[in-house]
């Protein structure tokens, strides 16, 4: 049987990435050009800057991917690209590059949901046993997705307001940390203790939903109130603040993930998205998820990368190109979401 090679593009936010996947499980290359240093001084991603960097880096990444994989264009089976969600301008750079490459080399084009990519990164690590549940946590998303069978994604719960990663970055700014601050907060948290009584929103409800805006506000208010009293808690108690904040986030993520698995029993729990790199979350999951298979991708596959897009595209390819192939009129879908699960569907 002829080998399957998928060339994938990912430009949804601030990483320009091109990857080549062989037969759905062998990642031949995963080129990533990061823009973090360009966005640090702004305290977050600036869409216009992100788009310009993608334009500068995309051709370089394509050439590097083909060279590292030792693959020529005529060996490729298909081209895949993130169509959303993400920043509109950033998405368009990847889509235009993918459409151009596909057209020039007479290859089918497969559009991919960015969050399906985060979910299917797990398939590059281990075999997913279905049905599965996925906790996807990043700067823009916090959601639980039920995967009844390969290639079927239904959202069972999400955040009502801020995503977990967004809360980390906003709290990080208050703490005086540079963007992105999640890793530093995690490191500080491991040196401190949960000494502050930060709220755990919706912990005792039976809804599979998150809420982190109240936690963020409570953190900001505590720092402000202490400053009014002449206490600089940022300078004097940074590690305990970080530990208390992280404990509140992880407690909520764990509680709602367990609730989702009670409502929708599964064989595998998958963790994906940038916040899945958090060691505090990984430790809790490893300690408490014992009845289901747990798949947590390595750090290199947690952030945005084209390898995960290729993995999701391979699942789509197996459905038959007549069902998934996009035309050259493919456009960005910045607000693309998974369908909500219907009552009684499972």
Swiss-Prot record:
Tell me the InterPro entries matching this sequence.
ATPase_NBD, Gcp-like_dom, KAE1/TsaD, TsaD
Chain residues that bind substrate: 136-140, 169, 182, 186, 278
Obligatory cofactor(s) = Fe(2+)
Record keywords: Acyltransferase, Cytoplasm, Iron, Metal-binding, Transferase, tRNA processing
Major subcellular location class: cytoplasm
Manner of cofactor binding, per the entry note: Binds 1 Fe(2+) ion per subunit.
Q: Which domain of life is it from?
A: Bacteria
**Provenance organism:** Lactococcus lactis subsp. lactis (strain IL1403) (Streptococcus lactis)
One GO BP annotation is: tRNA threonylcarbamoyladenosine modification
The job of this chain, per UniProt, is described as: Required for the formation of a threonylcarbamoyl group on adenosine at position 37 (t(6)A37) in tRNAs that read codons beginning with adenine. Is involved in the transfer of the threonylcarbamoyl moiety of threonylcarbamoyl-AMP (TC-AMP) to the N6 group of A37, together with TsaE and TsaB. TsaD likely plays a direct catalytic role in this reaction.
Q: Which GO terms describe its molecular function?
A: iron ion binding; N(6)-L-threonylcarbamoyladenine synthase activity
Q: What is the lineage of its organism?
A: Bacteria, Bacillati, Bacillota, Bacilli, Lactobacillales
Name the positions where Fe cation binds. Answer: 114, 118, 304
Location(s), subcellular? Cytoplasm
From the UniProt record, list the reaction(s) this protein catalyses. Answer: L-threonylcarbamoyladenylate + adenosine(37) in tRNA = N(6)-L-threonylcarbamoyladenosine(37) in tRNA + AMP + H(+)
Any one Gene Ontology cellular component term annotated for this protein: cytoplasm
EC numbers for this chain: 2.3.1.234
Q: What is this protein called?
A: tRNA N6-adenosine threonylcarbamoyltransferase
Show the PANTHER family listed in the entry. TRNA N6-ADENOSINE THREONYLCARBAMOYLTRANSFERASE (PTHR11735), TRNA N6-ADENOSINE THREONYLCARBAMOYLTRANSFERASE, MITOCHONDRIAL (PTHR11735:SF6)
Assigned protein family: Belongs to the KAE1 / TsaD family.
């Amino acid at each position: 049987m002829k080998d399957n090679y998928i060339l994938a593009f990912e430009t949804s936010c601030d990483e320009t990435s091109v990857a080549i996947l062989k037969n759905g499980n062998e990642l031949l290359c995963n080129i990533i050009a990061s823009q973090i240093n360009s966005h640090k001084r702004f305290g977050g991603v600036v869409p216009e800057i992100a788009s310009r960097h993608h334009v500068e880096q995309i051709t370089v990444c394509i050439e590097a991917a083909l060279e590292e994989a030792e693959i020529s264009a005529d060996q490729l089976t298909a081209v895949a690209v993130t169509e959303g969600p993400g920043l509109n301008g950033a998405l368009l750079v990847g889509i235009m590059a993918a459409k151009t490459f596909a057209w020039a080399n007479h290859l089918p084009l497969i559009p991919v949901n960015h969050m399906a990519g985060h979910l299917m990164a797990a398939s590059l690590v281990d075999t997913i046993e279905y049905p599965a549940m996925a906790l996807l946590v990043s700067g823009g998303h916090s959601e639980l997705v039920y995967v009844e069978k390969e290639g079927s994604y239904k959202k069972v719960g999400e955040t009502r307001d801020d995503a977990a990663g967004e809360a980390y970055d906003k709290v990080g700014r208050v703490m005086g940390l540079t963007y992105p601050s999640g890793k530093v907060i995690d490191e500080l948290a491991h040196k401190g203790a949960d000494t502050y009584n930060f709220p755990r929103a919706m912990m005792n409800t039976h809804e599979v939903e998150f809420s982190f805006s109240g936690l963020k506000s409570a953190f900001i208010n505590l720092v402000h109130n202490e400053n009014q009293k002449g206490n600089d808690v940022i300078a004097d108690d940074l590690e305990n603040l970080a530990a208390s904040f992280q404990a509140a986030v992880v407690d909520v993520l764990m509680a709602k993930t367990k609730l989702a698995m009670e409502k929708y029993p599964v064989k595998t729990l998958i963790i994906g998205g940038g916040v899945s790199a958090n060691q505090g979350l990984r430790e809790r999951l490893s300690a408490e998820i014992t009845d289901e298979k747990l798949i947590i991708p390595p750090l290199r596959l947690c952030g945005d990368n084209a390898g995960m897009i290729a993995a999701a595209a391979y699942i789509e390819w197996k459905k038959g190109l007549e069902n998934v192939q996009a035309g050259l009129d493919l456009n960005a879908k910045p607000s693309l979401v998974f369908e909500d699960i219907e009552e009684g569907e499972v």
